[in-house]
Amino acid sequence: MADQDQNTQQTGSEAPAFNLQRVYLKDLSVEMPNAPHIFLEQEGPAVEVTINVGGQRLAETVFESTVTVTVTTRVNDKVLYLVEGTQAGIFELANIPPEQMDPILGIVCPTMLYPYLRANVADAITRTSLPALHLTEVNFQALYEQRLAEMAQQQEQSADSGIILPPSATRQ
């Protein structure tokens, strides 16, 4: 009976665990370099949005995941505003198979963080007295697959160039 209890406890402690421990706004900046003169422009703005995903290991089973957005809005080639924000989260990932770690950190974690980032960016833009910009949904799976394809292409080009990179140089 005692052996069964120990086996149950071991199995329980070895079960995969995925927990969001904290969500926080790591960085947010708003610049309006051409204010107040830009407010006199009559043309509609052109919006450019770039999104990046990152992360780092903080402890054996604790990771920080980040989603960074840069929004540049221009009117007649003049910057109306530039917003840069990074939303971060601390996640516990224990007993996860190694082949699942990268997809979890590159897809699942950013998907959980992005709604917070969207709200923070919309709020920051509203505080400039301009209409809020509501960022569209992002398919982080497609973004992850695109990143994998780019990395594979870089490795292929490196192999063709005769330059040998250490394995750590090809990982992001």
UniProtKB/Swiss-Prot annotation:
Gene Ontology BP terms: protein folding; protein tetramerization; protein transport
Matches recorded under Pfam families: SecB (PF02556)
Keywords, comma-separated and alphabetical: Chaperone, Cytoplasm, Protein transport, Translocation, Transport
Single GO MF descriptor: unfolded protein binding
UniProt signal peptide: none
Gene Ontology, cellular component aspect: cytoplasm
Record-linked InterPro entries: SecB (IPR003708), SecB-like_sf (IPR035958)
Localization annotation: Cytoplasm
Gene3D superfamilies xref list: SecB-like
Protein's job: One of the proteins required for the normal export of preproteins out of the cell cytoplasm. It is a molecular chaperone that binds to a subset of precursor proteins, maintaining them in a translocation-competent state. It also specifically binds to its receptor SecA.
Family: Belongs to the SecB family.
Assembly and oligomerization: Homotetramer, a dimer of dimers. One homotetramer interacts with 1 SecA dimer.
NCBIfam families associated with the record: PRK05751.1-5, secB
Protein name (Swiss-Prot/TrEMBL): Protein-export protein SecB
